[in-house]
Amino acid sequence: MAPPTFADLGKSAKDLFNKGYNFGFLKIDSTTRAGDNKEVEFKSAASHNIGSGKLGGNLDVKYKIPQYGITLTEKWNTENQLGTVIEVNEQFGRGLKVTLDSLYAPHAGKRSGKVKLDWALPTARVTADVGVTSAPVINAAGVFSRDGWLIGAAATFDSSSNKLAATSLAFGHSTPQYTLHSFVINSTDFGASLYHKVASNVEVGTQLGWKVGGNGADYALATKYAPSRDLTVRAKVNSSSQVAVAATHSLSPALKLTLSTQFNLAANDAHKFGLGLEFDPSN
Protein backbone atom coordinates (compact mmCIF):
# COMPACT_ATOMS: atom_id res chain seq x y z
CA MET A 1 0.00 0.00 0.00
CA ALA A 2 1.33 3.44 -0.96
CA PRO A 3 2.08 5.96 1.78
CA PRO A 4 -0.13 9.05 2.11
CA THR A 5 0.59 12.29 0.30
CA PHE A 6 2.59 14.92 2.15
CA ALA A 7 -0.59 16.95 2.75
CA ASP A 8 -2.25 13.91 4.36
CA LEU A 9 0.52 13.18 6.87
CA GLY A 10 -1.03 13.32 10.34
CA LYS A 11 -4.51 13.25 8.79
CA SER A 12 -6.01 11.13 11.58
CA ALA A 13 -5.29 13.84 14.15
CA LYS A 14 -6.31 16.65 11.78
CA ASP A 15 -9.69 15.02 11.15
CA LEU A 16 -10.23 14.57 14.87
CA PHE A 17 -9.82 18.34 15.37
CA ASN A 18 -11.56 19.61 12.24
CA LYS A 19 -14.29 17.23 11.10
CA GLY A 20 -17.77 17.27 12.59
CA TYR A 21 -17.70 20.91 13.78
CA ASN A 22 -19.73 23.67 12.10
CA PHE A 23 -20.06 26.32 14.81
CA GLY A 24 -20.86 29.76 13.44
CA PHE A 25 -22.72 28.28 10.46
CA LEU A 26 -26.00 26.73 9.42
CA LYS A 27 -25.13 24.11 6.81
CA ILE A 28 -26.92 21.69 4.51
CA ASP A 29 -25.02 19.10 2.47
CA SER A 30 -26.53 16.68 -0.01
CA THR A 31 -25.01 13.89 -2.11
CA THR A 32 -26.91 11.80 -4.65
CA ARG A 33 -25.75 9.31 -7.27
CA ALA A 34 -27.23 8.12 -10.54
CA GLY A 35 -26.47 5.61 -13.27
CA ASP A 36 -26.31 1.84 -13.40
CA ASN A 37 -22.93 1.83 -11.65
CA LYS A 38 -23.43 5.10 -9.74
CA GLU A 39 -20.99 6.77 -12.12
CA VAL A 40 -22.68 10.18 -11.81
CA GLU A 41 -22.54 12.04 -8.51
CA PHE A 42 -24.34 15.27 -7.60
CA LYS A 43 -23.04 17.07 -4.53
CA SER A 44 -24.49 20.34 -3.27
CA ALA A 45 -23.88 22.44 -0.18
CA ALA A 46 -25.34 25.61 1.29
CA SER A 47 -24.17 27.56 4.32
CA HIS A 48 -25.28 30.62 6.26
CA ASN A 49 -22.73 32.53 8.32
CA ILE A 50 -24.58 33.40 11.51
CA GLY A 51 -22.21 36.24 12.37
CA SER A 52 -22.08 38.05 9.02
CA GLY A 53 -25.38 36.84 7.60
CA LYS A 54 -23.64 35.82 4.37
CA LEU A 55 -25.11 32.99 2.33
CA GLY A 56 -22.99 30.68 0.20
CA GLY A 57 -23.35 27.51 -1.75
CA ASN A 58 -21.85 25.27 -4.37
CA LEU A 59 -22.82 22.48 -6.76
CA ASP A 60 -20.47 19.75 -8.02
CA VAL A 61 -21.33 17.22 -10.71
CA LYS A 62 -18.90 14.32 -11.05
CA TYR A 63 -18.93 11.80 -13.90
CA LYS A 64 -16.70 8.72 -13.94
CA ILE A 65 -15.55 6.84 -17.05
CA PRO A 66 -13.78 3.88 -15.41
CA GLN A 67 -12.83 2.09 -18.64
CA TYR A 68 -10.59 5.05 -19.51
CA GLY A 69 -9.61 5.95 -15.95
CA ILE A 70 -11.17 9.39 -16.35
CA THR A 71 -13.18 11.41 -13.83
CA LEU A 72 -14.75 14.70 -14.93
CA THR A 73 -16.06 17.20 -12.36
CA GLU A 74 -17.94 20.42 -13.11
CA LYS A 75 -18.26 22.98 -10.31
CA TRP A 76 -20.26 26.14 -9.64
CA ASN A 77 -20.52 28.34 -6.57
CA THR A 78 -22.46 31.41 -5.49
CA GLU A 79 -19.41 33.59 -6.13
CA ASN A 80 -20.27 32.90 -9.80
CA GLN A 81 -17.12 30.86 -10.35
CA LEU A 82 -17.07 27.90 -12.73
CA GLY A 83 -14.60 25.09 -12.30
CA THR A 84 -13.62 22.02 -14.28
CA VAL A 85 -11.49 19.16 -12.96
CA ILE A 86 -10.29 16.36 -15.24
CA GLU A 87 -8.55 13.40 -13.59
CA VAL A 88 -6.77 10.73 -15.63
CA ASN A 89 -5.74 7.76 -13.51
CA GLU A 90 -3.10 5.17 -14.50
CA GLN A 91 -3.26 5.95 -18.23
CA PHE A 92 0.25 7.40 -18.43
CA GLY A 93 1.89 4.96 -16.02
CA ARG A 94 1.13 2.60 -13.15
CA GLY A 95 0.15 4.51 -10.02
CA LEU A 96 0.25 7.87 -11.84
CA LYS A 97 -2.70 10.27 -11.73
CA VAL A 98 -2.71 13.45 -13.81
CA THR A 99 -5.21 16.20 -12.97
CA LEU A 100 -6.13 19.41 -14.76
CA ASP A 101 -7.88 21.83 -12.39
CA SER A 102 -9.25 25.04 -13.90
CA LEU A 103 -11.37 27.93 -12.59
CA TYR A 104 -13.16 30.69 -14.49
CA ALA A 105 -14.86 33.79 -13.08
CA PRO A 106 -17.09 35.16 -15.90
CA HIS A 107 -17.96 38.41 -14.10
CA ALA A 108 -14.28 39.30 -13.69
CA GLY A 109 -12.96 37.63 -16.82
CA LYS A 110 -10.30 35.81 -14.81
CA ARG A 111 -9.01 32.33 -15.53
CA SER A 112 -6.66 30.14 -13.54
CA GLY A 113 -5.53 26.56 -13.71
CA LYS A 114 -3.16 23.94 -12.38
CA VAL A 115 -1.67 20.71 -13.64
CA LYS A 116 -1.22 18.17 -10.84
CA LEU A 117 0.69 14.90 -10.69
CA ASP A 118 0.31 12.16 -8.07
CA TRP A 119 2.56 9.10 -8.36
CA ALA A 120 1.87 6.33 -5.85
CA LEU A 121 4.40 3.52 -5.33
CA PRO A 122 4.46 0.77 -2.68
CA THR A 123 7.00 2.66 -0.53
CA ALA A 124 6.86 6.21 -1.93
CA ARG A 125 4.40 8.94 -2.89
CA VAL A 126 5.41 11.86 -5.08
CA THR A 127 3.15 14.83 -5.83
CA ALA A 128 3.64 18.03 -7.81
CA ASP A 129 1.56 20.84 -9.23
CA VAL A 130 2.29 23.85 -11.41
CA GLY A 131 0.13 26.85 -12.18
CA VAL A 132 -0.80 27.51 -15.80
CA THR A 133 0.46 31.11 -15.82
CA SER A 134 3.33 33.08 -17.33
CA ALA A 135 5.26 32.89 -14.03
CA PRO A 136 4.00 29.73 -12.36
CA VAL A 137 4.47 28.64 -8.78
CA ILE A 138 5.67 25.04 -8.57
CA ASN A 139 4.89 22.81 -5.59
CA ALA A 140 6.56 19.43 -5.14
CA ALA A 141 6.54 16.90 -2.31
CA GLY A 142 7.62 13.36 -1.58
CA VAL A 143 6.88 10.83 1.17
CA PHE A 144 8.79 7.61 1.77
CA SER A 145 7.74 4.78 4.09
CA ARG A 146 9.29 1.70 5.65
CA ASP A 147 7.79 -0.54 8.34
CA GLY A 148 5.30 2.16 9.36
CA TRP A 149 7.90 4.94 9.54
CA LEU A 150 7.27 7.95 7.31
CA ILE A 151 9.56 10.76 6.19
CA GLY A 152 8.56 13.53 3.82
CA ALA A 153 9.70 16.80 2.31
CA ALA A 154 7.93 19.56 0.39
CA ALA A 155 9.03 22.73 -1.37
CA THR A 156 7.46 25.66 -3.20
CA PHE A 157 9.39 27.38 -6.00
CA ASP A 158 8.39 30.82 -7.31
CA SER A 159 9.54 31.10 -10.91
CA SER A 160 8.95 34.86 -10.98
CA SER A 161 11.71 35.41 -8.41
CA ASN A 162 13.63 32.15 -9.03
CA LYS A 163 13.57 31.44 -5.30
CA LEU A 164 12.26 28.80 -2.94
CA ALA A 165 9.20 30.33 -1.32
CA ALA A 166 8.70 27.62 1.32
CA THR A 167 10.17 24.35 2.54
CA SER A 168 8.77 21.70 4.88
CA LEU A 169 10.04 18.51 6.47
CA ALA A 170 7.99 15.84 8.25
CA PHE A 171 8.68 12.64 10.14
CA GLY A 172 6.34 10.17 11.79
CA HIS A 173 5.14 6.67 12.48
CA SER A 174 1.76 5.13 11.74
CA THR A 175 -0.04 1.98 12.91
CA PRO A 176 -3.76 1.11 12.96
CA GLN A 177 -3.96 2.32 16.59
CA TYR A 178 -1.38 5.13 16.70
CA THR A 179 -0.22 7.93 14.43
CA LEU A 180 2.70 10.16 15.40
CA HIS A 181 3.49 13.12 13.16
CA SER A 182 6.08 15.90 13.49
CA PHE A 183 7.01 18.70 11.10
CA VAL A 184 9.02 21.87 10.58
CA ILE A 185 8.11 24.66 8.14
CA ASN A 186 10.71 27.15 6.87
CA SER A 187 12.89 26.36 9.91
CA THR A 188 10.65 28.64 11.99
CA ASP A 189 7.44 26.71 12.67
CA PHE A 190 7.62 23.42 14.56
CA GLY A 191 4.75 21.10 15.38
CA ALA A 192 3.67 17.59 16.26
CA SER A 193 0.48 15.59 16.64
CA LEU A 194 -0.48 12.27 18.20
CA TYR A 195 -3.56 10.20 17.40
CA HIS A 196 -4.64 7.13 19.36
CA LYS A 197 -7.59 4.83 18.73
CA VAL A 198 -8.26 3.74 22.29
CA ALA A 199 -11.16 1.45 21.37
CA SER A 200 -13.43 0.83 18.42
CA ASN A 201 -15.62 3.75 19.52
CA VAL A 202 -13.11 6.03 21.29
CA GLU A 203 -10.43 8.21 19.69
CA VAL A 204 -8.13 10.81 21.27
CA GLY A 205 -5.56 13.19 19.85
CA THR A 206 -3.28 16.08 20.68
CA GLN A 207 -1.53 18.82 18.72
CA LEU A 208 1.48 20.94 19.68
CA GLY A 209 2.94 23.93 17.84
CA TRP A 210 5.76 26.37 18.45
CA LYS A 211 7.08 29.30 16.40
CA VAL A 212 10.52 30.87 16.63
CA GLY A 213 10.12 34.25 18.29
CA GLY A 214 6.61 33.42 19.49
CA ASN A 215 5.19 33.84 22.97
CA GLY A 216 5.14 30.14 23.71
CA ALA A 217 3.79 26.82 22.57
CA ASP A 218 0.24 26.25 21.39
CA TYR A 219 -1.43 22.97 22.24
CA ALA A 220 -4.82 21.32 21.91
CA LEU A 221 -6.61 18.13 22.94
CA ALA A 222 -9.50 16.41 21.15
CA THR A 223 -11.61 13.30 21.56
CA LYS A 224 -14.36 11.45 19.72
CA TYR A 225 -16.79 9.01 21.33
CA ALA A 226 -19.53 6.97 19.69
CA PRO A 227 -21.80 5.55 22.44
CA SER A 228 -24.03 3.98 19.77
CA ARG A 229 -24.20 3.48 16.02
CA ASP A 230 -26.49 6.51 15.69
CA LEU A 231 -24.67 9.01 17.91
CA THR A 232 -21.16 10.49 17.83
CA VAL A 233 -19.92 13.07 20.35
CA ARG A 234 -16.83 15.20 19.79
CA ALA A 235 -14.98 17.66 22.04
CA LYS A 236 -11.78 19.69 21.89
CA VAL A 237 -9.95 22.36 23.89
CA ASN A 238 -6.89 24.47 23.11
CA SER A 239 -4.37 26.64 24.93
CA SER A 240 -6.42 29.78 24.14
CA SER A 241 -9.18 28.44 26.45
CA GLN A 242 -11.47 27.71 23.51
CA VAL A 243 -13.74 24.72 24.09
CA ALA A 244 -15.81 23.10 21.35
CA VAL A 245 -18.43 20.36 21.60
CA ALA A 246 -20.37 18.68 18.78
CA ALA A 247 -22.87 15.86 18.48
CA THR A 248 -23.90 14.05 15.30
CA HIS A 249 -27.07 11.96 15.31
CA SER A 250 -28.16 9.69 12.46
CA LEU A 251 -31.86 10.39 12.07
CA SER A 252 -31.97 7.71 9.37
CA PRO A 253 -29.39 5.84 7.29
CA ALA A 254 -29.46 8.71 4.78
CA LEU A 255 -29.82 11.74 7.07
CA LYS A 256 -27.48 13.10 9.76
CA LEU A 257 -27.99 16.07 12.09
CA THR A 258 -25.02 17.85 13.68
CA LEU A 259 -25.20 20.38 16.52
CA SER A 260 -22.03 22.13 17.63
CA THR A 261 -20.91 24.99 19.84
CA GLN A 262 -17.71 26.77 20.77
CA PHE A 263 -17.11 29.02 23.75
CA ASN A 264 -14.14 30.74 25.30
CA LEU A 265 -13.54 30.25 29.00
CA ALA A 266 -11.70 33.59 29.09
CA ALA A 267 -14.36 35.67 27.25
CA ASN A 268 -18.10 35.58 27.79
CA ASP A 269 -18.96 37.12 24.39
CA ALA A 270 -17.22 34.57 22.19
CA HIS A 271 -19.89 31.86 22.03
CA LYS A 272 -20.69 30.29 18.66
CA PHE A 273 -23.35 27.81 17.65
CA GLY A 274 -23.90 25.79 14.53
CA LEU A 275 -26.28 23.34 12.92
CA GLY A 276 -25.73 21.02 9.98
CA LEU A 277 -27.79 18.56 7.94
CA GLU A 278 -26.17 15.94 5.72
CA PHE A 279 -28.21 13.91 3.25
CA ASP A 280 -26.75 10.94 1.37
CA PRO A 281 -29.28 8.32 0.20
CA SER A 282 -26.50 5.93 -0.81
CA ASN A 283 -25.63 5.24 2.84
Curated annotation (Swiss-Prot):
Q: List the protein's name.
A: Probable voltage-dependent anion-selective channel
Describe the family membership recorded for this protein in Swiss-Prot or TrEMBL: Belongs to the eukaryotic mitochondrial porin family.
Membrane topology reported for the UniProt record: Multi-pass membrane protein
Mainly resides where? Answer: mitochondrion
> By its UniProt entry, which InterPro entries does this protein fall under?
Porin_dom_sf (IPR023614), Porin_Euk (IPR001925), Porin_Euk/Tom40 (IPR027246)
**Where does this protein come from, organism-wise?**
Caenorhabditis elegans
What would be an example GO MF term here? Answer: porin activity
Reported phenotype of the disruption mutant: RNAi-mediated knockdown results in a hyper-connected mitochondrial network in body wall muscle cells.
Q: What does this protein do?
A: Forms a channel through the cell membrane that allows diffusion of small hydrophilic molecules. Plays a role in maintaining mitochondrial morphology.
Its UniProt domain note says: Consists mainly of membrane-spanning sided beta-sheets.
Q: Which GO terms describe its cellular component?
A: mitochondrial outer membrane; mitochondrion; pore complex
Q: Which Pfam families match?
A: Porin_3
Q: Which UniProt keywords apply?
A: Ion transport, Membrane, Mitochondrion, Mitochondrion outer membrane, Porin, Transmembrane, Transmembrane beta strand, Transport
Task: Tell me the compartments it is located in.
Answer: Mitochondrion outer membrane
| Single GO BP term | mitochondrion organization
